[in-house]
Amino acid sequence: LNDLVRPIVEAAEHDPNVAGVLLKGSQSMGAADEESDWDVVVVLLEGEPSQKRDGRVELITTTLERVRGVSSWELPALAHSRVLLDKTGELAVAVEAAGRLTREELAELYDNYLNDFYRSLKAWRRGRELGARILSGRSLWWLGDLLMGLEGTRAPYTEYWAGRLGDLEPLIVEVARTADPRKQQELQAAVEQIATAHGFRDVYDGWNGDIDRVMTFRFE
């Protein structure tokens, strides 16, 4: 353990009200740089949440009940946390559960991606560049969550996506840079194959030919 974190874990080991300790953020994911802090979460059996900074350590105190019922926007952080201490075994269970997506969640991500792809291409066709670019960018948010979810894990926050998007990553980066509708069509065709292979053809078919139609659009 880092010298900044070790004393926190050692103190937690001897505190009967502490269920465990988590490390969150870039330090837990091997993505730290010289500006990265140490985000340490001390999980209590009982008590009030708190947060304080001590140099490069952000010390967060929460309860086991709150970890079990974490809000949806915090799930990526919990899913990619590192368990430093787990007296009851419940933290490991919570981290694992946070990383799982249901079929319903994955289907919704795919549908959201298709929706923004469809609307972006229609906007390009009508000469509405700003809307087309914004929709293209948002489509990639859904897509990243989908691709990592199909591989069995909840996506981390977007700043940690590099190197996690598989063979499609170069094309995704190109679409992120340009919002080029032709590149969007190329990407969607590849995504369609992946999603179909994972059993989500029903989502595509639910568009009743609308995606097929915008795939025939030609852009100069």
Model regions: which residues?
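Conserved NTP/Mg2+-binding pocket subregion across the NTase superfamily
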Residues: D3, E48-G131, F219-E220
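Short aromatic-enriched loop/helix-cap "lid" or pocket-rim segments at secondary-structure transitions
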Residues: D33-E35, S71, E159-W161
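Helical scaffold of the NTase/Pol beta-like nucleotidyltransferase catalytic core
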Residues: L1-V21
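A generic short-segment signal for beta-strand/edge and adjacent turn/coil regions
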Residues: R6-E13, S28-E34, E108
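Catalytic metal-binding acidic patch
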Residues: L23-E65
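Conserved nucleotidyltransferase catalytic core and NTase-mimicking acidic/glycine-rich helix/loop elements
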Residues: G99-E220
